[in-house]
């Protein structure tokens, strides 16, 4: 969960989010180096009292400021493409969860099990218990086994939604008539909250997401005792 006044990411709870945080630090380092060099160049030119009005070309400088930005973009693009490939490529998922966005709630279908499907609505303030989070708690959480690869198949029944859980590093558009796929693996038990991140109508702010990660034994027990 984010804290009041927090300026950085939430604690990473998936392998993908750990890599996203690492890539953020990598990109920020490159950005700092670029700003330092540009700032130094500007300051040096402003303080330089020597003026040459007859410079018509500078092949060496033009070569440097063409090749150097290309190399910097390459340094940023390669790790970014790697993470993008990892999130889209789901090789051996343990379970598949089909997620459907509605105005204004989510539906979850566990396709590997019979009749394990549910709708997930936001809990009104009057139903909250002490310690619950306002506008984030739901009546039915999406339960997943931790440390196992989960495949999400995401679509929508009406308008475009976006299924987003920051701690897991997951953000996928739910588009009517289209099935999007993403994979993630939770690294620790807990409850991770998110919200629809695509404006979808009057109650867009009131369709939260709650993902509960538990151990495999508890998950199988939950499936066995599940009542639609």
UniProtKB/Swiss-Prot annotation:
Presence of keyword Membrane: yes
Subcellular localization(s) per the UniProt record: Mitochondrion inner membrane
Signal peptide feature range: none
Keywords linked to the UniProt accession: Copper, Electron transport, Magnesium, Membrane, Metal-binding, Mitochondrion, Mitochondrion inner membrane, Respiratory chain, Translocase, Transmembrane, Transmembrane helix, Transport
Cofactor binding summary note: Binds a dinuclear copper A center per subunit.
EC supergroup of this enzyme: translocase
Binding site for Cu cation A1: 161, 196, 200, 207
Bilayer-crossing regions: 27-47, 61-81
Any GO BP annotation: ATP synthesis coupled electron transport
Enzymatic reactions: 4 Fe(II)-[cytochrome c] + O2 + 8 H(+)(in) = 4 Fe(III)-[cytochrome c] + 2 H2O + 4 H(+)(out)
EC numbers on record: 7.1.1.9
GO MF annotations, alphabetized: copper ion binding; cytochrome-c oxidase activity
Regions of this protein lying in the Mitochondrial intermembrane compartment: 1-26, 82-228
Keyword Transmembrane on entry: yes
InterPro entries associated with the record: CcO_II, CcO_II-like_C, CcO_II_C, Copper_CuA, Cupredoxin, Cyt_c_oxidase_su2, Cyt_c_oxidase_su2_TM_dom, Cyt_c_oxidase_su2_TM_sf
Membrane topology: Multi-pass membrane protein
Assembly description: Component of the cytochrome c oxidase (complex IV, CIV), a multisubunit enzyme composed of a catalytic core of 3 subunits and several supernumerary subunits. The complex exists as a monomer or a dimer and forms supercomplexes (SCs) in the inner mitochondrial membrane with ubiquinol-cytochrome c oxidoreductase (cytochrome b-c1 complex, complex III, CIII).
Family that this chain belongs to: Belongs to the cytochrome c oxidase subunit 2 family.
Record's protein name: Cytochrome c oxidase subunit 2
Gene that produces this protein: COII
């Amino acid at each position: 969960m984010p804290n009041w006044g927090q300026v950085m990411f939430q604690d990473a709870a998936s392998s993908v989010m750990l890599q996203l945080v690492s890539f953020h630090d990598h990109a920020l380092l490159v950005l700092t180096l670029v700003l330092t060099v540009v700032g130094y160049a500007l300051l040096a030119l402003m303080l330089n009292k020597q003026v040459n009005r007859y410079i018509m070309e500078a092949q060496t400088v033009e070569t440097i400021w063409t090749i150097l930005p290309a190399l910097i973009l390459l340094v940023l693009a390669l790790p970014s493409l790697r993470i993008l490939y990892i999130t889209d490529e789901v090789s051996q998922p343990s379970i598949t969860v089909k997620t459907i966005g509605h105005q204004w709630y989510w539906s979850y279908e566990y396709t590997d099990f019979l009749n394990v499907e549910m709708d997930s609505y936001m809990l009104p303030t009057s139903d909250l218990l002490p310690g619950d989070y306002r506008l984030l708690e739901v009546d039915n959480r999406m339960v997943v086994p931790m440390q196992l690869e989960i495949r999400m198949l995401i679509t929508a029944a009406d308008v475009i939604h976006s299924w987003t859980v920051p701690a897991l590093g997951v953000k996928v558009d739910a588009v009517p008539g289209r099935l999007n796929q993403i994979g993630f693996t939770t690294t620790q038990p807990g409850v991770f909250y998110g919200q629809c991140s695509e404006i979808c109508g009057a109650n867009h702010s009131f369709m939260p997401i709650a993902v509960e990660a538990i151990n495999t034994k508890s998950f199988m027990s939950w499936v066995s005792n599940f009542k639609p």
